[in-house]
Structure formats: C-alpha cells, structure tokens
C-alpha cells in the first residue's frame, strides 16, 4: 500500500481528542511509509493530519477545489497540491491517487466523500 486517502473535516472540533487522533493518523502513516491524500486544507482536522505527516517526513498530497484556494485555506506545505475545478474532480483524484481510505470525523462533505469511495 503506497497511499491512503483521508476523509475528514476542515473544522477544529471542540474536543481536542479529535485533533490528537488526526495527528496520530498522519504521523502513523508517515512512520509506515504510507503517503496521505487529503482535501488540501491547512485548517482543522485536515491540517492536523497533513502537518503531522509532513513533520514525520511523510508524503502529503492535497487535492483542493479552485474556489477554496482563493479563500486562503489551501495548505502550501504539501508535497504536492492539486488544484481542481470542483468536488467531482476532487473525489475522482482521491480515488486515482490512493490505494484505500480512512475516515475520521467531519461533516456532510466528509460523508459525501466516504459514500463516493464506498460506491
């Protein structure tokens, strides 16, 4: 297994256990030589996964819709950052670039990505 897609929220949850879990996921994957493919954000759980994987020397590939790049939420420190036209292309690229997926808490967008991956 080379890379896993991580589906998670861009918000910072009230309970810090979720941030700790996101960091553990990123660090754990990097320690095993497994790259991270994720939503490309620098905030919330997304940012925690990316930052911890990068800090551990891991590969982090962000996939972010063009509309979100303009609002300055894109993580500029990713190994690769793919800017795509919209959510459909984002979900397709998640599938193309990864060998499996992990879902950690998020909102409606996370659930949408999860169901797309399952189907």
Which sequence ranges carry the predicted segments?
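A cross-family phosphate/adenosyl-ligand binding-site feature
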Residues: 1-97
């Amino acid at each position: 297994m080379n890379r896993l897609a991580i589906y998670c929220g861009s918000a910072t949850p009230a309970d810090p256990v979720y941030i700790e879990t996101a960091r553990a996921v990123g660090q754990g994957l990097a320690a095993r030589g497994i790259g991270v493919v994720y939503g490309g954000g620098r905030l919330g759980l997304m940012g925690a996964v990316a930052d911890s994987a990068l800090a551990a020397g891991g590969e982090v590939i962000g996939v972010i819709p063009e509309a979100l790049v303009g609002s300055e939420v894109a993580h500029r420190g990713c190994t690769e950052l793919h800017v795509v036209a919209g959510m459909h292309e984002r979900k397709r690229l998640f599938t193309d670039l990864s060998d499996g997926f992990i879902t950690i808490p998020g909102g409606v967008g996370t659930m949408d990505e999860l169901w797309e991956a399952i189907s």
